[in-house]
Curated annotation (Swiss-Prot):
Residues 76-87 are annotated as: Sufficient for PI(4)P binding. This is Protein STIG1. Expressed in the stigma and the upper section of the style. Keywords: Apoplast, Secreted, Signal. Residues 80-83 are annotated as: Sufficient for binding to the extracellular domain of PRK2. Pfam families: Stig1 (PF04885). Disulfide bonds: none annotated. Residues 88-115 are annotated as: Sufficient for PI(3)P binding. Interacts with PRK1 and PRK2 (via extracellular domain). Coiled coil: none annotated. It comes from Solanum lycopersicum (Tomato). Belongs to the STIG1 family. InterPro entries: Stig-like (IPR006969).
């Protein structure tokens, strides 16, 4: 019990943000809840909505982010939950804002493809199987 009281006292005096790994991120200024807790994440970086500052109207910042996103490339990027995402590679915004690839597919060039079967994206995006080969379980094998 003394250890818990000591830990709470140290955390209360600390100015370092505290991260709680349970689907939520919490610190002294920001608070948000991860709405994608049921999604299996790969080792690739996944774009999530940024934390929102409590008690502050962020509309000016949000507008700036979306305008900057459109300036980068109106046809390749999208402002999704106030975050600029790449429509050619983002699984949650593949080809257009909000179009989510189903489990087992990957966003390659703005199209959701099954990299285990697709001859033009075998095992990874843009990995084309040679003529006479088929994509089987993500590997190019002789037909």
């Amino acid at each position: 019990m003394d250890f818990i009281i000591l830990l709470i006292a140290i955390l209360a005096l600390s100015s370092t943000p505290i991260t709680i790994i349970s689907g939520s991120v919490t610190n002294h200024t920001y608070s948000t809840t991860n709405s994608y807790t049921n999604v299996a994440l790969s080792a690739r970086k996944v774009v999530f909505p940024p934390p929102r500052q409590l008690g502050k109207d962020n509309s000016d910042d949000d507008d700036l982010i979306c305008k900057t996103c459109k300036r980068l490339s109106e046809h390749r990027t999208c402002c999704f939950n106030y975050f600029c995402v790449d429509l050619f590679t983002n699984r949650f915004n593949c080809g257009s804002c909000g179009l989510v690839c189903i489990v087992g597919t990957r966003c390659c060039g703005g199209i959701c493809v099954d990299i285990k079967k697709d001859n033009g994206n075998c095992g990874k995006c843009n990995n084309v199987c040679s003529p006479g080969q088929n994509c089987s379980f993500g590997l190019c094998v002789s037909a």
